[in-house]
Amino acid sequence: MYRFSTYKRQYKANLKLALPVVMTQLGQILVQVADNVMVGRYGGDDPTPLAATSFGGSVFFILFIAGVGIALGLTPLIGELYAQGDRCKSSQYLQNGLMFYTLLGFLVCGLQLAVIPLMYHMGQPVEVVDMAIPYYKLLAYSMPFIMLFFTFKQFLEGVGNTRVEMVVVILCNLMNVGLNWIFIYGHLGFEELGATGAGLGTLGSRIAMPIMIIGYFYKKQKYRAYLQGFSPRNYSVKTIRTLLRMGLPISLQMFLEASAFVGTSIMMGWLSKTAISANQIAMTLGNCAFMIVTSIGAATTIRISHCYGARSLKELTLAAKASYHLVIAWNLFAAITFISLCNVIPTFFTTNAEVIDLASKLILLIAVYQLADGIQNVSVGILRGIQDVKIIMPIAFLSYIVFNLPVGYLLGFTLGMGAQGLILGFTVGLTPAVLLIVRYRRDIRRWKAGIR
C-alpha cells in the first residue's frame, strides 16, 4: 500500500537533484525554441525561415544527441565512485573523459558537415534546404564546445551537483536571445541575417558554456583538486574502453530515438511546408515536456548510482519508485495542459492560420503518449544507475525502428492520415518500454539473491 510518508524523503532528494537539471534541460531545448520563435516572427506569414531552422535543427540533432549520449555514461561511473569516496579514480575518469569526449566532438562536427550534400535528397523544398544549410553549419561548429561542456556537466552530476550547470545554461540562454536579437533582425549596426543569425547566436552561447563551467572548477578548491590530480600516467585505454562501454549503448538508444523524431520531421517535409512548421511547433512543445522527463531520469541515475555505490538495496528501490511517482504526476499534468491550450500555444510561434490549425491537432496527439514516454525514461535512468545498459539499445531499436517509423508511415501515407498519422506512430512505438521495467525488476531480484 502506498504511504506518502514512506516516500517523502525520497521525493525531496530526487527533486533536489532534478529541479536544477530541469532548468538545464529546458535551457538546452529553449535554445532551439528561441531560434524558432524569433525566426518565425522574422518570417511572418512566410513559413520558409521557420521551416529552415526546423529542418536544420532536426538534422543536427540526430548526431548531436549521439555524441552527448556517450558523455552521459560518465555520470553513473562517477556516482558509484563518489559514494565510495574514491577521488583518485574519479579524477582519472575526468581526465580521460576530457580528452575522449572533446575529440569525439570534433569527429561529430566533421560528420555533420559531411552530411550537408545529402540534405538536398531528403525530400525537402529546395528553398528550405538553401536557407537551412548556413544555420546548420554554425550548429555543427558548436559540437566540440558542447562536448567539452558536457564532460564537466556529467562529472558534476555524478558527484550530486546539478546547480552549476543550471546557472551556466540560464546565462548562456540569455546570451543566445541577445545575440539572436542582434543577428536575426540586424540591430546594433549588424546586417540582418534571419535564420543564419540564429545560428550565430547559438554558436556564440555554446562557446561560452565550457568557459564558464571550467572557470567554476578552477574557482572551487574541492573541484580544482580533481584537476590537480591529472597526470600523463592517468591516460588509459582501459579507462576509455570503460567510458565507451557505458556510453555507447546510451548513445545508440538516444540516436535511435532521435532518428525516429528526425525521420518523422523529414516525412513531414514530404507533405508540405505547413506540415514542417506545424510539426516543429508541436515537437518543440513535446520536447519541453520531454526534457523535464529526462531531467527526472537524470536525477534518477544520480540517486541510483549513489545507492548502487553504497550497496544500499532498500534505498535504491525506494528512490526508483519515487521517480516513477514523480514522472507519472508530471506527465499527467503535461497532457492536461496540452489538451487545454492546444489552440492557443501555436499562436506564439506563427501568424499563419494553416500552421496554427494543424499544430493544434498535432499537440493533442503529443499529449497521448506522455505517460509511456515518462515511464520509459525513468526506467532507462534506473538501468544507467546500476550500470546495466546493454538492454537499452535493443529495446530502443524495437520501439523506434521496428514499430514507430513503419507505423507512422503506414498511418500517414498509406492510410492517408497525413501529419497526424505520423505523430500517432510514436504512441505505438513506446509500447515495448514496459520491457525496461521487467529488466529492472529482474536486476533487483538477482541482487537480492546475491548474483549482482
Show which residues each predicted segment covers.
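Small-residue-rich hydrophobic transmembrane alpha-helices
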Residues: 50-109, 113, 146-165, 278-342, ...
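Alpha-helical transmembrane segments and their lipid-water interface positions
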Residues: 28, 32-39, 64-71, 75, ...
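Transmembrane alpha-helix boundary and packing residues in multipass membrane permease domains
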Residues: 21, 25, 36-37, 76, ...
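Helix-terminus/linker motif at the lipid-water interface of multi-pass membrane proteins
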Residues: 26, 30-51, 119-126, 182-193, ...
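Short alpha-helical transmembrane segments in multi-pass integral membrane proteins
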Residues: 1-18, 78-144, 190-248, 304-369, ...
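Transmembrane helical elements of multi-pass membrane transporters/channels
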Residues: 16-35, 138, 158, 172, ...
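N-terminal transmembrane alpha-helices
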Residues: 6-37, 41-45, 58-73, 77, ...
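Short runs within selected transmembrane alpha-helices of multi-pass transporters and secretion channels
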Residues: 68-71, 139-157, 165-173, 198-214, ...
